Amino acid sequence: MNRKFYLKTIIATLLFSLSTLTAPARGGDFTAGKNTFLLNGQPFVVKAAELHYPRIPRPYWDQRIKMCKALGMNTICLYVFWNIHEQQEGKFDFTGNNDVAAFCRLAQKNGMYVIVRPGPYVCAEWEMGGLPWWLLKKKDIRLREDDPYFLARVKAFEAEVGRQLAPLTIQNGGPIIMVQVENEYGSYGVNKQYVSQIRDIVKASGFDKVTLFQCDWASNFENNGLDDLLWTMNFGTGSNIDAQFKRLKQLRPETPLMCSEFWSGWFDKWGARHEMRPAKAMVEGIDEMLSKNISFSLYMTHGGTSFGHWAGANSPGFAPDVTSYDYDAPINEYGHATPKFWELRKTMQKYNGGKRLPDVPKPAAPIITIPKMTLTEFSPLDLGMSMPTTSHDIKSFEEMNLGWGAMFYATKLPQIEKSSRLSLNEAHD
C-alpha cells in the first residue's frame, strides 16, 4: 500500500472517530401511545425521582443524581422556581446553583431523562409557591388568573426558561421528555382560559414539540383539563391506586397512566413533629404501579434544604415550613440512603430488565459534628436598621420594596387607665 495513502486513511479515521465523540446526540421522540408511553417508538415506563436543584448545593448535584439512578430511577423530575431566577423584575439569573440547564445536562450525562415543571406556580412548600415577591407591588394584581400584567411577566419568564432548556428537549438530542403546564390548578380554581394561556406561553417558549402535561388530583382534574394535554394524577402512599385512575380511564381509556407526584412522606411545619410515612406503604404502592405499567414520579426522592428565606408557609392561618425539606424521603436531607431507600431498591431491582442496578455512590461529604458553644455577646434588634421611615399604617414588605429579611415596627400606644389585652392578628409577611 502507498505509504502516503495509508497515512491519509489513518488521519481520516481518527478525525471521523473524534467527530463521533464530540457530535451532539441525535434527536429522539417521546410520546403518549396506546396505554403506554413510547420512547423512540418503544414502550417506556417513567420511573422518576423528584429533585430540586436550588435545595441541593451544586457540588452535590452529581452524587444525588447517581443516588437516584442506583435506586432504579430512569428520570429526574424538577420544578423551575421563578422567584429564584428573577429576584428583581427583569433581571434573570441562571448561574451557579441556579444553572438548571447544567443540572439537566448532568442528568443526561448520568443516563437519566428529565421532566421539567416550569410553573409559573410550583407550590413545593417554597416561598410564595415560586411566584416573585415583586408581583405584589401591583396591588390589584390577580395571581394565577388571566390578569394582563401577570401573564406578561409569566411570558417573559417562560421565554427565559425556553432559552435555557428548549435546546435540551429529546427532539434536540437532550434529556427532557415532558414539560408540565401550571401545577395542580384544579385545587386552586376553575379557569380553563387561564390554563390555556399558560399552555400557549409554554409552547411559544420553545416547548412546541415535547410532550406537555398537566397534573391534578383525582377529585378535581376535570376542572381545567385541556383536551390536547396529557393528564396525570397526584396522590400519596396508602392510596387506592385503581380508584385514583378510575375516572381518568373512563374519560380516556387508552391513555398511558402516570402518578406525577407519589408522595414519599410529607413536609414539616414549625412547632410540629417530624412527619414520617412507613416505607411499606410507599414500596407497595410503587410495586403495584410498576406491575401495571403505570409511570410515576416519587415526590420527594431527595428533598434537601430550603436555604435562606426560601421555605414557604401553608394556610389557612399561618403555618411556616422549616428549612429542612427532608420529607422523610428515601434519600435524606444530607444525601444518605435511609432504610426506605434500601427497601425500595429491592423492589426497583425487579423492574430493571434483568440488569443489576448501579452501585450506591459514597456520600458527597462527611457529616461534621459542631461542638457546644456559649454565646457571650448580643446585639439590639433595631441596631443598623437601614430604611427608617414613618407611616400612619403598617407597611408591607412590597410597599417598602423588600423581598425578604426582617422589618422592625415600632409605635407609641396611648396611655390607658386599666390593663387591656392587645391583639395583633395575622401579623406576618
Language model segments and positions:
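Bacterial N-terminal signal peptides that target proteins for export
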Residues: 1-11
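Aromatic-lined substrate-binding rim segments of carbohydrate-active enzymes
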Residues: 61-127, 199-210
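Carbohydrate-binding surfaces of carbohydrate-active enzymes
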Residues: 151-180, 186, 191-195, 199, ...
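Conserved residues at the C-terminal ends of beta-strands
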Residues: 50-52, 79, 182, 302
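Bacterial N-terminal signal peptides
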Residues: 10-20
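N-terminal carbohydrate-binding accessory modules
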Residues: 24-75, 105, 109-111
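Aromatic- and acidic-residue-enriched carbohydrate-binding clefts of CAZyme catalytic domains
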Residues: 79-91, 96, 124-149, 316-328
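Substrate-binding/catalytic cleft of secreted carbohydrate-active enzymes
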Residues: 116, 120-153, 159-298
